[in-house]
Amino acid sequence: MKFKSIAFALAAIAAVAAKAPASAADLELLEAGKLQVATEGTFPPFSMRAPDGSLDGLEIRVMTEVAKRLNLTYTPVLIKWDSLLVGLQADQYDVISASMDITAERQKKVTFANGWLESGGRIVVQADSPIKSAADLKGKTVGALVSSTFAKIAEDKGATVKGYKAESDAMQDLVNGNIDATITDSIAGAYAIKNAHMPLAMTDDFVSRIQKGFAIKKGKPELVKAINKALADIVADGTYAKLTVDLIGFDPAPKEPIQSVE
């Protein structure tokens, strides 16, 4: 009887431990019980404000679910695009979740969790623009996020690049006629044109094919592993599809996610 009591007690302790928040030491978190995540809040449908003022969007939903799977509280930190990497290196948050493309150059500075979304770059123009493809960008003024993949693409095409700290500012400048085009994520562009009722259009060609990743400061392998497992579980059990299809009408999970490189 005594042994049974001990067994029950051990089982109860194990159950509590399984539900307990991961410790800061285990996952190299800045604060125990919290997953502090940098996001912009200005890039629909990835990160934006819902009608009630709360944060919503693809990356908000997915990262909130990741935190839940890790028994952590999702804690957003609103940061402008050009300060994201600096803040991560300064330990202002644990993860960057800001529609960041996984590139070889960025992999030298941060560790990305496995790719969580597949998309591509598209050119957005005014509805009556003569720009029909990337070949037409030469000599034009093209808006793009500062230090982004799309800014480099526009520059390589011979365009004069105007940098922005928020995608929404570039789209509005395009509507106002201050730039000739902007290059943005295809999902974001389609969402803005449809839901913000902007008089804009996208050209047919993709200027890039990309995967987006959650960025983590180098030297935190346990946190990377934990996020990768949570992402895989979310996709496998159908939760990812439910979270994303509801917002954009399809499942953007990569068929072959780019793997983490320390």
Feature names for model-found ranges:
Residues Q36, L72-T73, A90-A98, K140-T141, ...:
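Alpha-to-beta junction loops
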Residues S83-V86, A98-K108, D180-S208:
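A ligand-binding cleft/hinge motif common to bilobed small-molecule-binding domains
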Residues L117-V125, A190-A232, F250-E262:
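Periplasmic-binding protein-like
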